[in-house]
Amino acid sequence: MGEILLKNISVNGNECDMLIEDGRISRIADAGTIAYDGADVVECRGKVAMPGFVNMHTHAGMAMMRGIGEDIAFHQWLDRIWEIEKNLDEEYVYHATKVACLEMIKTGTTAFNDQYWYMPMAYKAVSEMGLRALLSYVVCDRNDPEESERQKVQCQEMYEASKSWSDMVTFVISIHAIYSVSESMILWASDFARKNGLKIHVHLSETEKEVSDCMAQHGGMSPVEYLDSLGVLGEDVIAAHTLWLSDKDVEILGKRGVTCVHNVNSNLKLASGYKFKYNELRDAGANVCLGTDGCASSNNLDMLETMKTSAMIQKAWRNDTSAMPINELIEMVTVNPAKVLGINVGRIEEGALADLLLIDVGSYHFMSPGSFEANLIYSAHSDCVDSVICNGRFLMKNRVVPGEKEILAEAKKYLHRIM
């Protein structure tokens, strides 16, 4: 792995030199004070270094499904997606995942938590693109006993195969949702995850209907109460959406230390709701992060857009301009996900893994004495991301991702699978 020397880069408001060696930030010092023979020396004047974003809930294989389920109710949308997915194969998922990775790189994401099918091909795509990822084996038996048994065997086979994966990618168990997975399969999946030290990823309390149906079927228990009664919830659980919550639900999620992922654009677009209980979850002890959801529901994977919309909706529905402040927004896409990843990312400091962005502050979006973070979130767009480094390697330099045109051209050949 080659060394990189970033000259005259702004770090926390100071002009510095930064040396990257063996995938880590090895030294940060005053500008002009680091010399290193053989390093790739990059002049960074006019650019700011910040941690790469982590997208904590998405479906990368949906990257070519934008615009196919518009203006219909959530459960109609879900039925349409499931019908389309019957025609997909591993080659489609491979190319769609590469498209998703390309978009994430272009918009500043260096790691993501994915839930989709054909895991081996997703792994191939992610490895080729150079991002970090949590990739899920998705349990979704739809109460079919034969399908349950098939998935158990396949899950165990794929987990064994994953032991040869790069340490950039982590195997995760996904329980699709309580309405699509039988109780016996939920118990099996959570037990398998715990026996093997794996994270559990689940859609939870996404819609009002999910909650009312659960209460009708499970003696008045909410989805959160139901999963808790089964012993599923814990610090190893990543719960996507957690939108329709009672005070008791919030208390349980906080007490169990669950990671709750807010997917604002998907929730808004599918009219799932908007009153995400950020303050309450944070104060209860939950680890709150942000995600985009898949492109079939949110239509892009832009974490800057996600941050801006999340904050503005919080401020509006709470009638509180201080809701979801800037520093906490940044933490929700950097430091908080790092707790789940269990690695030293999310900060620009010596010894940290070199997953970082170089932000070009030369545009009118940053022509202000206001804070860099405020201008980044509320004024700029993702095209301000000039370069992306992940694990000490440039994935994008000066807005160019190697092979980008070829990735799109190859993927285009597979669009007919969803038409």
Question: What do these predicted regions represent?
Answer:
Residues 122-243:
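Metal-coordinating catalytic core of metallo-dependent amide/deamination hydrolases
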Residues 66-131, 153-165, 412-418:
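Alpha-helical scaffold segments that flank or form the walls of functional sites
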